[in-house]
């Protein structure tokens, strides 16, 4: 039962992300911003704080990595607005107020506010639009993120617990599941780093996912090179992405 629940939750997350990608306005740009923010914050944290700073006990690098990892809300807020065509100054205004929020709630808030800002840019005269955005956008972004954060985090915790339960009961089954899902996710606009961070995979499940990705990423590299899909850079990208 735990295996079915874990597989079902993984599939549900992928289906929701795919539907958002296909049917939501600026869905692809939004997910690219989400993926970019995850890579810009969590990847430096993983390398600097854990892989280098933690292993060699270099506190300076640990502090830098932890700082980068704590700014995911700002990063996703700015990148989401920029990808949706919002002026850079307005994007930074929105991103800064999302400092204390996790990746997904901050993304949802920034995604919604971006459409409001685009409407303001069209309707309000240039120069005055800055004042209007300052008065409206930060408050709405902060309020929206505050409202949805408890529900979003509780849902993600339940999903992550279901996946973790599979690893506790049958690690081989979880290896098969993650070995299939994560590399395939890395070959799409969806990011495997975003997927694993949203699911909250840590400890044994993350280790299982890393082991399976090591083999399947190499297969991706050979497959793309032999089939001449997208050239050498594309083959290298689909190999490296799941390993992040």
Predicted regions and their residues:
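Pore-lining transmembrane helices
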Residues: 2-244
């Amino acid at each position: 039962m735990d295996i079915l629940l874990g597989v079902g939750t993984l599939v549900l997350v992928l289906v929701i992300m795919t539907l958002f990608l296909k049917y939501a306005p600026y869905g692809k740009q939004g997910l690219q911003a989400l993926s970019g923010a995850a890579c810009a914050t969590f990847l430096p944290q993983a390398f600097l704080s854990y892989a280098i700073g933690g292993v060699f006990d270099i506190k300076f690098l640990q502090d830098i990595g932890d700082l980068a990892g704590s700014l995911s809300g700002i990063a996703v807020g700015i990148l989401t607005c920029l990808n949706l065509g919002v002026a850079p100054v307005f994007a930074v205004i929105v991103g800064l107020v999302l400092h204390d929020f996790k990746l997904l709630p901050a993304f949802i808030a920034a995604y919604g506010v971006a459409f409001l800002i685009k409407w303001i840019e069209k309707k309000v005269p240039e120069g005055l639009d800055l004042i209007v955005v300052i008065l409206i956008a930060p408050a709405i972004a902060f309020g929206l993120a505050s409202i949805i954060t408890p529900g979003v985090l509780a849902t993600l915790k339940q999903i992550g617990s279901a996946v973790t339960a599979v690893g506790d009961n049958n690690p081989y089954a979880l290896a098969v599941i993650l070995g299939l899902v994560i590399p395939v996710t890395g070959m799409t606009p969806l990011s495997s780093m975003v997927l694993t961070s949203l699911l909250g995979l840590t400890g044994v499940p993350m280790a299982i996912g890393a082991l399976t990705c090591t083999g399947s990423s190499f297969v991706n590299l050979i497959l793309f090179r032999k089939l001449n899909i997208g050239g050498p850079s594309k083959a290298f990208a689909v190999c490296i992405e799941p390993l992040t």
